[in-house]
């Protein structure tokens, strides 16, 4: 799409859909073109080439999130092969800075959207819960860059975190009771009181240089 400072109908529609300002959309369109090489779509390979992601231990999960149909609000599981600029904006909207005049209801919606995005990164098999094995894998990946932490230690950390999640969400469990995994409602409880609204950002796409939404 061609964007200009004369707010086109298409740009206004994107403003309404994503919550970004026209100025922010212009900035992100330049970044999209830089990533895609001025093509109309980007694929995983375009994001894999971002230097800031090369040392990120969960790079593959971050890249996959851009192509996850759940995050693209397509209402189904699986991944798309490529995304266009509007779909790119949809993903970037999860990282959109909060507006200073945003009311409590909109802040709550924004928070829930961000947490759903994170939940989807953990819930790799799309069964609506994060199992112990899924959580272990993420923890192992996060700690893989630390040579002083062995795999078994990472597994123990994941196991402990899952037990804590169970105590928060279920309470006192019976000795023979099995916690099958973290549901999205559980996930909301675990993150309660944590300021995800302002902490969740995306550094490798230069979001810091984008003005906050008005």
Swiss-Prot record:
Monomer. Homodimer. GO terms for molecular function: calcium ion binding; magnesium ion binding; phosphatase inhibitor activity; protein homodimerization activity; protein kinase inhibitor activity. GO terms for cellular component: cytoplasm; lamellipodium; nucleus; plasma membrane; ruffle; ruffle membrane. Belongs to the calcineurin regulatory subunit family. CHP subfamily. Functions as an integral cofactor in cell pH regulation by controlling plasma membrane-type Na(+)/H(+) exchange activity. Promotes the induction of hematopoietic stem cell differentiation toward megakaryocytic lineage. Essential for the coupling of ERK cascade activation with the expression of ETS family genes in megakaryocytic differentiation. Also involved in granulocytic differentiation in a ERK-dependent manner. Inhibits the phosphatase activity of calcineurin. It is a lipid-anchor. A lipid is attached at residue 2 (N-myristoyl glycine). It comes from Xenopus tropicalis. Residues 110-145 form the EF-hand domain. Keywords: Calcium, Cell membrane, Cell projection, Cytoplasm, Differentiation, Lipoprotein, Membrane, Metal-binding, Myristate, Nucleus, Protein kinase inhibitor. SUPFAM superfamilies: EF-hand. This is Calcineurin B homologous protein 3. Binds calcium via its EF-hands. Calcium-binding mediates a conformational change. Can also bind magnesium. The keyword Nucleus applies. Disulfide bonds: none annotated. Pfam families: EF-hand_6. Its main location: nucleus. One of its GO terms (biological process) is positive regulation of sodium:proton antiporter activity. PANTHER family: CALCINEURIN B HOMOLOGOUS PROTEIN 3. It comes from the Eukaryota. Gene3D superfamilies: EF-hand. It is found in: Nucleus; Cytoplasm; Membrane; Cell membrane. Ca(2+) binds at residues 123, 125, 127, 129, 134.
């Amino acid at each position: 799409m061609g964007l200009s400072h004369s707010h086109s109908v298409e740009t206004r529609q994107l403003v309404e859909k994503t919550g970004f300002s026209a100025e922010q959309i212009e900035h992100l369109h330049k970044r999209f073109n830089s990533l895609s090489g001025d093509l109309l779509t980007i694929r995983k390979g375009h994001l894999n080439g971002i230097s800031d992601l090369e040392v990120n231990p969960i790079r593959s999960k971050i890249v996959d999130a851009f192509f996850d149909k759940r995050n693209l609000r397509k209402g189904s599981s699986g991944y798309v092969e490529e995304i266009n600029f509007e779909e790119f904006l949809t993903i970037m909207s999860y990282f959109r800075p909060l507006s200073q005049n945003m009311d409590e209801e909109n802040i709550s919606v924004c928070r829930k959207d961000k947490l759903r995005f994170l939940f989807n990164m953990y819930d790799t098999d799309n069964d609506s819960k994060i199992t112990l094995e899924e959580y272990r894998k993420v923890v192992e990946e996060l700690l893989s860059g630390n040579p002083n932490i062995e795999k078994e230690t990472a597994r123990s950390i994941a196991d402990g975190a899952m037990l804590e999640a169970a105590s928060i969400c279920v309470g006192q469990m019976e000795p023979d009771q099995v916690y099958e995994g973290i549901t999205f409602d559980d996930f909301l409880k675990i993150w309660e009181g944590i300021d995800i609204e302002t902490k969740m950002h995306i550094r490798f796409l230069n979001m810091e240089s984008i003005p906050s939404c008005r």
